[in-house]
Amino acid sequence: MSLALLCPGQGAQHPAMFDRVRDLAAARPVLDATSELLGRDVFAAATADDRFDNVQAQPLLCAASLAHWQGLREVLPTPTVIAGYSIGELAAHAIAGSIDAATCLALSAQRAHLMDAASPDDAGLQAVLGVDRIATQRLCDAHGAFIAIASGYDHFIVGGAWRSLHALAEDAQSHGAEIRPLPVHVPAHTPLLAGAVAPFAAALEAASLQAPRLPLLAGIDARPVRDRATMVHTLSAQLAQTIEWAQVMRQAFERGARVFLQLGPGNALARMIAPAYPCCEVRAVEEFHSLEGAAAWVHSALERLQ
């Protein structure tokens, strides 16, 4: 049995998101680079009210996943597969060796600025739970919205103008769906951000990239990324294309992953996977008091499943 590492997307930032790595020497280069990029101390940035703004959130999320990895890489077995949810896919590439941490952070900032520039005003994302994909697509078609992320059989993130999302929410709730607003202010992974795709592809082409050294699954099609060209395509195309997260998790399982560890803030990805794959062991780093506790759990989980 083998290990999958997951890097989260936006929404779970919180003031204590760097507490487990605050005094970790191995994480210091990542934290210092993030502070320099943001123009303020990374710990202060995590507590600030603007931590959900794209230009703050995306570097913070990459930094959190990479800092956790720096503290765990010497004590964990080599992952069988790595995947990232939205901006988490960029962090996943840094873990897989496609880019270094500094390049990852710089690209995250460029990504955020390009998404903001391409985004229409008064738009964003919300979660729709309790209806299947066909019903969700019908709701989107009826109200001018789009499926941004397919997280599970009846769990979707939809994007669009807020007016469209409010109308969709009322319609969906009348059919028994649950709606959860998200603190994301751009309609990521929808055609509304098509204007950001080519500029971000150009930024990726100009960066120092290489093929991943570890197996990594792309969010848009759940296929392994094996070369530089595919990396550029999948990371740029996802800005305006649906993330097929449920398919990514299915492929991770099919590739032998039975222990899943979410890096970074929160445990949203772990909570998605656990009920869908009850035969697997699934946790998030932030469910433990320390990185040592998370590493000990990984080793014990792998032993239990042998």
Report the location of each language-model feature:
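Flexible, low-complexity segments
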Residues: A64-I82, L239-Q306
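Short beta-strand
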Residues: A44-A45, G84, F146-S151
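Alpha/beta catalytic cores of group-transfer enzymes, especially the acyltransferase/condensing modules
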Residues: Q10-G11, I95-L239
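Conserved small-residue
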Residues: C7-G9, T34, S65, G88, ...
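Helix-rich "cap/lid" substructures immediately adjacent to catalytic or cofactor-binding pockets
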Residues: M1-A83, V158
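Gly/Ala-rich beta-loop-alpha elbow adjacent to hydrolase catalytic centers
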Residues: S65, T80, G84-G88, A92, ...
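Short glycine-aspartate micro-motif
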Residues: A4-L5, I82-G84, C104, F260-Q262
